[in-house]
């Protein structure tokens, strides 16, 4: 096996791409735009929880899903994205693409967006990059506002509708992500969000605190209250973690919640006994 970045090549020629999850170190909503999207800014960081994507030559395009969070991907953005990329480039992509879904679905961890970015980036490189970076960003954002971030990963400030990305210095942290086994709908959470928000911190203050490595003291998620109103499991998880002395933060529009550091074995067992998933991760 050889490895280049997140691409592995197996002995039989099957390509394997590692598509990382992300967490939001805060999500601030500035208001709603005329086009229906929200203006936001957020600090996002990739973590070492991965979907594995297997790609090999095939007689036609086929996208399959396996793993603990597999589902029918015929209408998934990876399938639709490859078809659209094929139309734009005039190339047929006769590949069998198998996505091993290890990242929980509807968790606020960006799994589908990361998968899309990984596959389209790979296909673009196979064609010797007919799409330059901005074109690729625009293409990906037409499917998912999170997807452009995954072209580079690491740590970034995302703003606008989430499609504008400013790369930041990585933040080294151990975190534990807990998925309460409920698939939250991003559109449903954003659609239910009606509150007028006041920015507790200015963007300049957030960036300054990041430079001081003080990430824990800036995190705020304007969607958390709305998500809890829709999905009671998120609130139950947050209250449980608070009751045992941890400071939990919701990622994205939910449903996953994370804490900095590791949980005790006793707490992990208590969470898993409820059917919830616990992942010990590091930022990457």
UniProtKB/Swiss-Prot annotation:
Active site location: 22, 146
Annotated InterPro entries: GHMP_kinase_C_dom, GHMP_kinase_C_sf, GHMP_kinase_N_dom, IspE, Ribosomal_Su5_D2-typ_SF, Ribsml_uS5_D2-typ_fold_subgr
EC number(s) reported in the record: 2.7.1.148
GO biological process: isopentenyl diphosphate biosynthetic process, methylerythritol 4-phosphate pathway; terpenoid biosynthetic process
EC class: transferase
Pathway: Isoprenoid biosynthesis; isopentenyl diphosphate biosynthesis via DXP pathway; isopentenyl diphosphate from 1-deoxy-D-xylulose 5-phosphate: step 3/6
Catalytic activity: 4-CDP-2-C-methyl-D-erythritol + ATP = 4-CDP-2-C-methyl-D-erythritol 2-phosphate + ADP + H(+)
Parts of the chain that traverse the membrane: none
Residues at which ATP binds: 104-114
Record keywords: ATP-binding, Isoprene biosynthesis, Kinase, Nucleotide-binding, Transferase
Transferase recorded as keyword: yes
A GO MF term: ATP binding
Domain of life of the organism encoding this protein: Bacteria
Entry keyword annotation includes DNA-binding: no
Family: Belongs to the GHMP kinase family. IspE subfamily.
Function (record text): Catalyzes the phosphorylation of the position 2 hydroxy group of 4-diphosphocytidyl-2C-methyl-D-erythritol.
Name recorded for this polypeptide: 4-diphosphocytidyl-2-C-methyl-D-erythritol kinase
Species, as recorded: Hydrogenobaculum sp. (strain Y04AAS1)
This protein's encoding gene: ispE
């Amino acid at each position: 096996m050889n490895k280049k970045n997140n691409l592995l090549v197996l002995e039989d020629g099957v390509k394997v791409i590692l598509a990382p999850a992300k967490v939001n170190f805060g999500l601030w909503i500035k208001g709603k735009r005329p086009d229906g999207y929200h203006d936001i800014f957020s600090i996002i960081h990739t973590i070492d929880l991965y979907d594995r994507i297997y790609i090999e030559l095939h007689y036609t395009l086929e996208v399959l899903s396996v793993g603990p969070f597999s589902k029918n991907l015929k209408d998934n953005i990876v399938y639709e994205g490859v078809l659209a990329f094929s139309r734009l480039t005039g190339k047929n992509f006769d590949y069998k693409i198998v996505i091993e879904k290890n990242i929980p679905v509807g968790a606020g961890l960006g799994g589908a967006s990361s998968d899309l970015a990984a596959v389209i980036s790979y296909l673009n490189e196979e064609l010797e990059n007919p799409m330059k970076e901005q074109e690729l960003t625009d293409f990906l954002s037409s499917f998912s506002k999170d997807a452009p971030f995954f072209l580079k990963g690491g740590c970034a400030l995302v703003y606008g509708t989430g499609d504008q990305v400013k790369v930041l210095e990585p933040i080294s942290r151990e975190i534990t992500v807990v998925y309460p086994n409920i698939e939250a709908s991003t559109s449903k959470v954003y659609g239910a969000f009606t509150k007028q928000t006041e920015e507790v911190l200015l963007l300049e203050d957030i960036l300054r605190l990041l430079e001081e490595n003080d990430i824990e003291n800036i995190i705020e998620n304007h969607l958390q209250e709305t998500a809890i109103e829709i999905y009671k499991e998120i609130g139950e998880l947050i209250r449980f973690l608070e009751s045992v002395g941890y400071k939990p933060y919701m990622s994205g529009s939910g449903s996953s919640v994370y804490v900095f550091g590791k949980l005790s074995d006793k707490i992990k067992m208590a969470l898993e006994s409820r059917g919830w998933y616990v992942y010990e991760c590091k930022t990457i």
